[in-house]
């Protein structure tokens, strides 16, 4: 009986130490395609300032599909084939509809998301993947996880 209790206590101690070590490593986790695929994120911040969607308006978003297909909407709908390497997301040749939006912020967001995807955006996840941050030296966009299902 003592051997069983001693074994269980040792197992718990080893497990606790291993768990603590992995939590410390989460801050340095390099985001992978698997972390992003099949998720939809809605915009919450632009360059550190909170973004609120207008009443009855669609929330600007970015979604990652199978094989890193990227789609979303700011003012216009956009889409492209993403590639994630060493925590940097790129999508060359992003396609985008070209409608005019009366909201100047949404028009600027079209340019910002296009620039981030075309030139490469550093990708990070916070709060267990609930917050997605895309950034470069000019722009930081923060999104909140809001999956369709």
Model feature map: region roles:
Residues 17-79, 83-149:
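Lipid interaction determinants
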């Amino acid at each position: 009986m003592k051997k069983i209790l001693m074994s269980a206590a040792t197992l718990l101690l080893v497990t606790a130490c291993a768990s603590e070590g992995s939590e410390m490593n989460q801050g340095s986790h390099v985001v992978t395609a698997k972390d992003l695929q099949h998720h939809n994120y809605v915009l919450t911040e632009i360059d550190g300032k909170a973004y609120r969607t207008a009443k009855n308006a669609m929330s600007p978003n970015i979604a990652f599909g199978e094989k890193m297909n990227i789609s979303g909407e700011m003012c216009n709908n956009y889409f492209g084939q993403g590639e994630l390497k060493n925590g940097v997301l790129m999508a060359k040749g992003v396609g985008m509809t070209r409608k005019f939006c009366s909201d100047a912020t949404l028009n600027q967001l079209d340019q910002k998301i296009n620039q981030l995807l075309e030139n490469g955006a550093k990708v990070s996840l916070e709060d267990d993947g609930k917050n997605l941050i895309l950034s470069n030296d000019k722009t930081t966009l923060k999104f909140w996880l809001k999956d369709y299902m």
